Amino acid sequence: MSEIIHFETLGCKLNQVESEGAASSFKNAGFEISMSPFSAATAENLSVKLCVVNTCTVTAKAEQKARRIIRLLLAKCPKSAVLVTGCYAQNSRDEILAIGKKICVLGGQYKGHLADVPEILKQNPQLYGEELAAFIQKSFETIYKTPGKNQIQEPFRLVPDDFAHHSRSSLKIQDGCNCVCT
């Protein structure tokens, strides 16, 4: 059985499209993809290597829901790391990291780097949980500090090849965000 990458997507259609695009990157790298939302009734899953939570921050309720899902994934996927991205990750990095040691954060401004994570996982198959989260976070921090990389990624990097998990496709025209969160 191949390792599973699980996605939870909150918020707008853009997040849904970008989660599909990131899922395509992982699928093309040989990982199995799960996009069915977890609930309290979901059984523990030891095959999940990484959970990706694409967040929203339009309301305080959206942030609360993101924190609840992050905690749920930490409990239901004990071997996995949890990668949090999106608007909430952009605005509240330290708050999210304080939830647990198996968490890494990729701000929404750098979300295009999700496409780099499959290669990180392939090159480091021995890493799980806390060690994997720390390694991914360190990789992101290197990207943030590299001249020329500390910029918004090409806006269409996470456009999916196909829409395997939705019945309708979306056409991305723009992000609609100038990435100057305060």
Across the structure, where does each feature detected by a protein language model lie?
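Proteins enriched for Cys/Gly/acidic motifs involved in redox and nucleic-acid/cofactor modification
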Residues: 1-182
